Regions:
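Long, hydrophobic alpha/beta structural blocks
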Residues: 1-81
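Structural detector for short beta-strands of small beta-barrel domains
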Residues: 52-57, 63, 86-106, 169-181
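Short alpha-helix capping/helix-loop boundary micro-motifs
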Residues: 77-83, 126-132
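OB-fold and OB-like beta-barrel modules that bind single-stranded nucleic acids
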Residues: 89-98, 134-150, 161-164
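OB-fold (S1/OB) nucleic-acid-binding surfaces
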Residues: 101-126
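Long, charge-rich boundary regions
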Residues: 131, 137, 209-250
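OB-fold/S1-family single-stranded nucleic acid-binding modules
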Residues: 147-179
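Short cysteine-rich clusters marking metal-coordination/redox-active sites
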Residues: 180-183, 198-201
């Protein structure tokens, strides 16, 4: 019934059901007096949605709370690179300065340059945006939001990435052996600093050719999969949504 409820009430309610994993997202994980919680844009939308949810138990009633869930409030302030305190959250804008590396568990780590500081960043497998992180190259300008993980004996301090917004993409240039203009075949290297030669016709070249490789990612915002959203994560459909209701009653 939750899946059906979401299909009817979306986008006035959100993050109720994960269609990709066929998973209900409104129920608590452990023993809890709260049976479920529906996130939405108004009192009317969440109360209406609750009437569509079937339960085997008789519920005592409901309460509606005004909250900052789905607002990304914790990521609105810029982090101070000269004073990155553990457990603080915010955003940074910088350029990729180390090649992304996939480590054990499928998590991806890279660093960005912000001013004169290098900040290590981690994109975790469960977010399902690790492929995006893997496709970053040196020089890409990105806007990241997340929280600072405390350094430990085995791991350095890292920004746990909660969103990745690509601002500018560098050209991905690959240097290759030149192509013979007569034979349309790749030339062979004659040795270190000796240039290239076509072994069919003898044409020579002294420099490699530049080939631009199309980028697999775009200039856009990438959010984690809905299953990895935190309570404050602002989903795509709420990016330009700003509720300004002052009256809060039923």
């Amino acid at each position: 019934s939750v899946k059906k409820m979401q299909s009817i009430t979306f986008p006035e309610t959100y993050n109720s059901f994960d269609n990709e994993n066929d998973r209900v997202l409104i129920t608590p994980h452990g023993p809890d007096p709260v049976f479920y919680g529906i996130r939405g844009e108004s009192v009317k939308s969440v109360v209406l949605a609750s009437t569509m949810v079937d339960t085997d138990e008789k519920l005592d009633g409901y309460m509606v709370f005004k909250s900052n869930q789905g607002t990304a409030d914790h990521l609105k302030n810029e982090l101070q690179v000269n004073d990155l305190k553990p457990y603080t959250s915010g955003f940074l804008v910088g350029k990729v300065c180390s090649k992304p590396v996939t480590e054990q568990g499928g998590h991806v780590f890279f660093s960005i340059q912000v001013g004169d500081r290098k900040i290590r960043c981690g994109v975790y497998k469960q977010t399902k945006i690790t492929k995006i992180a893997q496709d970053l190259i040196l020089g890409d300008k990105i806007h990241l939001g997340g929280g600072i993980r405390k350094a430990s004996k085995n791991y350095e301090r890292v920004l746990n990435v909660e969103f990745l917004d690509v601002i500018k993409l560098e050209k991905n240039i690959l240097l290759t052996n030149p192509t013979c203009k007569t034979c349309n075949k790749k030339m062979k290297s004659k040795g270190n600093r000796q240039g290239f030669e076509c072994f069919r016709c003898g044409n020579k070249s002294f420099s490699k050719s530049s080939l631009e490789i199309p980028r697999k990612i775009q200039r856009k915002l990438y959010l984690p999969a809905i299953s990895a959203h935190r309570h404050l994560t602002r989903p795509y459909q709420r990016l330009k949504k700003r509720n300004k209701f002052e009256i809060f009653d039923t």
